[in-house]
């Protein structure tokens, strides 16, 4: 058994915790910091205070455990070599228990997709939220309904960070890893912090599972686990023995092993079981035997922690200092659903939600279907197009119409969204982004639909785009999307993503009466002296009136054909089409005056701005805070409205010399900013199916800041000092780069795949792919002659004449050489694979070589002519 050591806590967390503690206790930060670092030592007063506070709630579940677990369920497995339990009992364990206060901890549960890891993580999260911790979560699971058991591809995980201060991310890396099988260990061990706590379900580490996970030997017997505190727990054995009194099938019994893990973690971090017990009883109220079995397994895991001496050193994360109010733990999909309901109520409209099930947006449909009492009508259509069309129809009849989907569905809905835009009807389109293209990564986050949301419709079809930045902000983003759609009579795209949608955090419930009343353009009367004009616009918002069918005298046409301004009659007039196109665009641009300005956070005197949008908010904000605390000058700003941008965006951008844009795509916001504001940006881009961690951004931002202002200076000095040699150097060095133009990591990945397919060494493939080395001896004349003979005249020509034509000519040999080399390499591979013993193939090889020699001779003649 590994030596008991405190969890590794980053210094910045200790400082944040000390500052909060000093503020509430009226003591100095230094004193609070000393208390935190010394609380695990029983000789110091703060420890006594912590133990008195902690033991009261702990004893209550302990007493219940003794009453329920009368049989020696835990005592027998405890006598295994894994723990030294024969010398302990519950009373001695409680007396010897130590409680270490820590400001934060990150825990990751990992196992097969059928092991209930999402449930365990959610229950621990909810219990911590009720206790009063601030928290953030990161669920991760395979796209398959039932992924291959015991394989790394089938691993499901749930990460949660709990803290006694305000946090914005689920943690950089887990301090505690609960691995239910070898595959879970294989998938997540590399993320565990040094000296982290590793809890293994030892019953799953048999030869079959070890090989299935890709291990050659049992990882517990290797050096791989050195540097971690390893705790082996016989979870399956404990489950079987605890539930033997229940009349349940064997497989059903083993499904409860996740409750063993939850009970043990609850003991280790001083969480009460009562809330989870209540949840189990409610969940299985129609299956009381199953409910009792799960509660028994839960208490068995808790009791194991009490009994086993290795778990006597426990941890406590105090309540966070959150603003007063009523809180609930909420994920992004639920928050978004509630925001739509609130918007409908504040507009005094019924809510219609038309959708087709798609990951990860389906939970919105499920949640809204529970709220018929708020006049919510949900419609599950046969496909994405039908769902969108039904929503447009509902909007025409005066409902707050919403349709929801993810990337592939947004593509299918695009024509119907154009219809709503042309008809100028209010519609909220929810797009929960995921990895693409096509089916892509259905359960992984990505921000790759921004450009599609902006421009993914035929014709000139601008519309507002709003992005949720966190699970709790999803409520307000949905409410804002509703406000804009109704006020400006337009479709609005609301962007979320899998990280926001499935992640959770505590959310302070708003006072409904404090939410703005939402007006509408609904009308039941004529809007001019001459009657009703369906496209007679409001002079402030440019929105047309909203008249629903059945109102006498307000009959009018809607549809996809262009309408005449004012009357709404079908019109093919060219001037009218220009006018209507401009008016629709101006209506959207005008919204910039009706949204909050872009705010700057951090060090506003900095030269560097970190600019993000959507779900990158938490990682960016936390990274900037850390950098500021280290003395690094940097500021941040974040878009929640990405079309139109806030009206002060240009002013904000002009205040900074360097703009860094982190995105979970390949630079889509950067492209928009460059096109709109003519500013240069530096992207931090990632499409790995994972969100940014604060540590990852902190390191990359600091590296970029250190490089700003210096990377161009040596080049400038070189050009001024020696103009002629510098030009020659640039030509000689840059042209080979243009020939390759491929990032190093892509070259390596390509070489590895090619080597594997051809059965040759990676080194040989790299040599063939290298731009500086020939793939075959016959290529030597081409490679050697081109740079020497052709480059020098080009350089001199560029130097002697500043016109554009010679510069263009200078580029042509580079392109030609790239094409030639690719052709030659393909030819070489064809010849290598051809069986030369066959007569027809001999002729083929001969023809190819003759053609190549002919080309080389022509080239030599061209060179002589040029000279």
Question: How should each PLM-predicted stretch be described?
Answer:
Residues 322, 330-339, 347, 477, ...:
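Flexible, low-complexity linker and terminal segments
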Residues 94, 101-194, 338, 343, ...:
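Thiamine diphosphate
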Residues 1-33, 39, 726-767:
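Intrinsically disordered, low-complexity regulatory segments in eukaryotic proteins
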Residues 40-91, 714-739, 767, 771-846, ...:
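Acidic, proline-/serine-/threonine-rich low-complexity intrinsically disordered repeat tracts
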Residues 104-105, 241-243, 310-325, 343-350, ...:
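Gly-rich Lys/Arg/Thr-decorated short loops/hinges at beta-loop-alpha junctions or inter-strand turns
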Residues 64-67, 76-85, 279-312, 547-588:
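Helix-enriched interaction subdomains in cytosolic or periplasmic regions
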Residues 86-347:
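Active-site cofactor/cluster-binding pocket
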Residues 171, 225-228, 232-236, 444-491, ...:
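Conserved thiamine diphosphate
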């Amino acid at each position: 058994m590994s030596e008991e050591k405190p969890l590794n806590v980053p210094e910045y967390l200790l400082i944040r915790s000390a500052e909060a503690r000093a503020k509430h206790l009226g003591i100095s930060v230094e004193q609070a910091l000393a208390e935190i670092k010394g609380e695990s030592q029983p000789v110091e007063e703060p420890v006594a205070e912590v133990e008195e506070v902690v033991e009261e709630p702990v004893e209550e579940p302990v007493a219940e455990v003794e009453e329920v677990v009368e049989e020696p369920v835990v005592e027998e497995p405890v006598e295994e070599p894994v723990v030294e339990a024969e010398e302990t009992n519950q009373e001695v364990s409680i007396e010897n228990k130590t409680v270490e206060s820590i400001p934060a901890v990150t825990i990751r549960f990992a196992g097969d997709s059928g092991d209930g890891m999402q449930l365990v993580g959610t229950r621990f999260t909810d219990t911590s939220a009720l206790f009063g911790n601030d928290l953030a979560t990161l669920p991760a699971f395979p796209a398959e309904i039932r992924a291959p058991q015991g394989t790394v591809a089938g691993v499901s995980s749930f990460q949660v960070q709990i803290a006694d201060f305000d946090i914005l991310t689920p943690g950089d890396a887990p301090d505690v890893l609960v691995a239910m099988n070898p595959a879970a260990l294989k998938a997540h061990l590399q993320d565990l912090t040094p000296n982290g706590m590793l809890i293994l379900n030892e019953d799953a580490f048999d030869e079959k599972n070890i090989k299935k996970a890709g291990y050659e030997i049992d990882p517990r017997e290797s050096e791989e686990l050195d540097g971690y505190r390893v705790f082996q727990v016989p979870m399956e054995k404990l489950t079987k023995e605890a539930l033997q009194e229940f009349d349940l099938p064997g497989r059903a019994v083993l499904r409860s092993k996740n409750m063993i893990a939850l009970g043990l973690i609850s003991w280790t971090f001083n969480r009460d079981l009562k809330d989870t017990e209540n949840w189990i009883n409610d969940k299985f109220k129609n299956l009381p035997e199953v409910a009792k079995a799960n509660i028994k397994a839960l208490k068995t895991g808790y009791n194991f922690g009490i009994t086993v001496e290795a778990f006597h050193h426990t941890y406590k994360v105090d309540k966070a200092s959150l603003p007063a109010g009523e809180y609930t733990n909420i994920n992004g999909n639920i928050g978004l659903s509630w925001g739509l309901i609130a918007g409908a109520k504040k507009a005094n409209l019924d809510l219609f939600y038309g959708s087709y099930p798609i990951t990860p947006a389906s939970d919105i449909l499920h949640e809204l279907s529970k709220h018929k009492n708020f006049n919510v009508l949900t419609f599950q259509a046969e496909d994405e197009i039908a769902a969108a069309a039904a929503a447009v129809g509902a909007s025409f009849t005066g409902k707050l119409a919403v349709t929801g989907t993810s990337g592939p569905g947004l593509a299918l809905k695009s024509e119907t969204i154009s219809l709503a835009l042309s008809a100028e009807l209010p519609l909220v389109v929810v797009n929960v982004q995921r990895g693409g293209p096509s089916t892509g990564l259905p359960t992984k986050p990505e921000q790759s639909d921004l450009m599609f949301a902006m421009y993914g419709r035929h014709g000139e079809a601008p519309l507002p785009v709003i992005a949720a930045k966190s699970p709790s902000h999803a409520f307000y983003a949905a409410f804002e999307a509703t406000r804009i759609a109704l006020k400006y009579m337009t479709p609005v795209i609301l962007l979320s993503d899998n990280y926001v949608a499935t992640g959770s955090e505590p959310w302070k419930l708003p006072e409904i009466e404090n939410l703005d009343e939402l007006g509408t353009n609904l009308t039941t009367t004529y809007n001019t002296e001459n009657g009703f004009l369906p496209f007679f616009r409001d002079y402030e918002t440019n929105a047309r009136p909203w008249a629903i069918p059945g109102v006498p005298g307000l009959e009018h046409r809607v549809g996809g054909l262009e309408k005449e301004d004012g009357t709404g009659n079908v019109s093919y007039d060219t001037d009218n089409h220009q006018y209507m196109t401009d008016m629709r665009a101006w209506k959207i641009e005008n919204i910039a005056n009706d949204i909050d300005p872009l705010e700057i956070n951090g060090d506003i005197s900095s030269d560097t701005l970190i600019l993000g949008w959507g779900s990158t908010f938490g990682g960016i904000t936390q990274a900037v805070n850390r950098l500021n605390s280290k003395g690094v000058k940097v500021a941040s700003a974040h878009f929640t409205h990405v079309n139109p941008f806030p009206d002060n965006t240009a002013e904000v951008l002009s205040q900074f010399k360097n703009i860094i844009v982190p995105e979970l795509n390949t630079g889509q916001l950067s492209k928009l900013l460059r096109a709109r504001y003519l500013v240069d940006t530096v992207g931090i881009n990632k499409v790995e199916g994972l969100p940014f961690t604060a540590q990852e951004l902190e390191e990359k931002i600091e590296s970029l800041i250190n490089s700003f202002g210096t990377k161009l200076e040596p080049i400038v000095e070189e050009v001024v000092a020696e103009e002629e040699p510098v030009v020659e150097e640039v030509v000689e060095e840059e042209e080979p780069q243009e020939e390759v133009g491929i990032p190093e990591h892509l070259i390596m990945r390509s070489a590895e795949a090619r080597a594997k397919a051809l059965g040759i060494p990676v080194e040989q493939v790299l040599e063939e792919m290298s731009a500086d080395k020939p793939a075959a001896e016959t290529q030597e004349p081409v490679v050697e002659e081109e740079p020497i003979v052709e480059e020098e005249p080009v350089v001199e020509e560029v130097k002697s004449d500043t016109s554009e034509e010679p510069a263009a000519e200078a580029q042509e040999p580079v392109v030609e050489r790239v094409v030639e080399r690719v052709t030659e390499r393909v030819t070489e591979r064809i010849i290598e694979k051809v069986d030369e013993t066959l007569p027809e193939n001999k002729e083929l090889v001969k023809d190819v070589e003759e053609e190549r020699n002919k080309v080389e001779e022509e080239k030599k003649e061209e060179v002589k002519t040029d000279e």
